[in-house]
Amino acid sequence: MPASASPSIAGLLLAGGRATRMDGVDKGLQLLDGTPLALHVLSRLSPQVDETLISANRHADRYAELGAPFDARIVADETPDFPGPLAGLLAGMRAARAPLVACSPCDTPYLPADLVARLQAALDAQQADIAMAVTVDAQHVRSPQPTFALLRTSLADDLAARLAAGDRKVRAWYARHKTVEVEFHDERAFYNANSWQELAALARR
């Protein structure tokens, strides 16, 4: 993209959580096959977007180092109490130069290579505010994946108001806006690590 061009989609890596089920470690910095989880995700997400942001509330210098090959910028929550992914999303929406933000957790190393394109196609086709991934397994069970989404940055003020009111649930906030669900049939692409056991399992997949 030429330096003078305006980016159309920002990618946002959500790495600002507390990882309470992993003894509070910084999940994105844990290694899979010798590489930090966050770098696995950045390597898949950044080629799909025009600018890259990393939501990180700890170890900002380390994330800046990981993000340097992608010209990533670091953003932090506006509040210090780790209020959850919506706070990271808000920080990214505020910082983005693009009108759309595509978000992904930092612990999903098999992120689909066509995630953003498919979300954008659905968003445009339905003239929606938010496009959210949904996995469908072999038994046709649908599982929403709300932290894999494409959102309009114009929603930032509403999100800020809901966070100020104490709302923390991602899907509850999505329900306030026109949201389209996009089905993905490759469950493996959305596997993540919420525990040490799941991190070990990722290495075996």
Swiss-Prot record:
Assembly description: Monomer.
Domain comment as written in the entry: The N-terminal domain determines nucleotide recognition and specific binding, while the C-terminal domain determines the specific binding to the target protein.
Subcellular location: Cytoplasm
Binding-site list for Mg(2+): 107
Main localisation: cytoplasm
This protein's name: Molybdenum cofactor guanylyltransferase
A biological process from GO: bis(molybdopterin guanine dinucleotide)molybdenum biosynthetic process
Family indicated by similarity: Belongs to the MobA family.
EC top class, as a word: transferase
Gene Ontology cellular component list: cytoplasm
Species, as recorded: Burkholderia lata (strain ATCC 17760 / DSM 23089 / LMG 22485 / NCIMB 9086 / R18194 / 383)
UniProt KW Cytoplasm keyword: yes
Pfam families: NTP_transf_3
Residues holding GTP: 14-16, 27, 77, 107
Reaction equation(s) it catalyzes: Mo-molybdopterin + GTP + H(+) = Mo-molybdopterin guanine dinucleotide + diphosphate
The enzyme's E.C. designation: 2.7.7.77
Protein purpose: Transfers a GMP moiety from GTP to Mo-molybdopterin (Mo-MPT) cofactor (Moco or molybdenum cofactor) to form Mo-molybdopterin guanine dinucleotide (Mo-MGD) cofactor.
NCBIfam families recorded: molyb_mobA
Domain of life (superkingdom): Bacteria
Gene: mobA
